[in-house]
């Protein structure tokens, strides 16, 4: 396994997403339905309050919504040689410092921790340190993505744009 030529010098690079991600009540509910998480704190503010929270509680994997956008941005900004139209998550880890709640504004500081290539496959590890408006840690997300080495593909840019718009 080797570091792709295009990725040399990128390891350890930092990217701060320009805007925050606003956690919305309805997005929490929609996501909880999608992942079939029926815990009442995701749907009912009274249930969340009774459980000790001031707002709806996001499911543990809710961060994936904002994380996907950040990952696409970092692959584009750093020109990582991976075909993002044909990539999947190999692994994802979260370290929570507090619960994500409705109305949170989340800020992402993202780092490219590693990129390796072997036999036409690229493995990239991306870490995001997520903070709130006060700069306090909310969660650390570490995602390992696996995909084919980027090649010129006539439809790749259209596919990436479609994925980014979701």
Swiss-Prot record:
The record, for SUPFAM superfamilies, names:
Thioesterase/thiol ester dehydrase-isomerase
The membrane-spanning stretches of this chain are: none
Lineage: superkingdom: Bacteria
Return the CDD domains for the record. R_hydratase_like (cd03441)
Domain MaoC-like as annotated: residue spans = 10-131
Q: Cite a single Pfam family from the UniProt record.
A: FAS1_DH_region
By sequence similarity, the record places it as follows: Belongs to the UPF0336 family.
Protein name according to UniProt: UPF0336 protein ML2425
């Amino acid at each position: 396994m080797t570091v792709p030529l295009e990725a040399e010098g990128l390891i350890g690079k930092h990217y701060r997403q320009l805007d925050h991600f606003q956690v919305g009540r309805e997005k929490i509910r929609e996501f909880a339905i999608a992942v079939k998480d029926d815990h009442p704190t995701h749907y009912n503010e009274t249930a969340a309050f009774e459980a000790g929270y001031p707002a709806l509680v996001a499911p543990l994997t809710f961060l994936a919504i904002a994380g996907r956008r950040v990952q696409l941005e970092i692959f584009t900004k750093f020109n990582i040689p991976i075909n993002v139209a044909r990539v999947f998550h190999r692994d994802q880890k979260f370290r929570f410092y507090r619960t994500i709640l409705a109305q949170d504004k989340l800020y992402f500081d993202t780092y490219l921790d590693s990129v390796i290539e072997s036999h036409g496959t690229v493995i990239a590890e991306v870490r995001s340190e997520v903070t709130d408006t006060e700069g306090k840690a909310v969660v650390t997300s570490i995602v390992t993505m696996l995909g084919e080495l980027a090649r010129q593909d006539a439809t790749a840019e259209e596919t990436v744009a479609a994925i980014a718009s979701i």
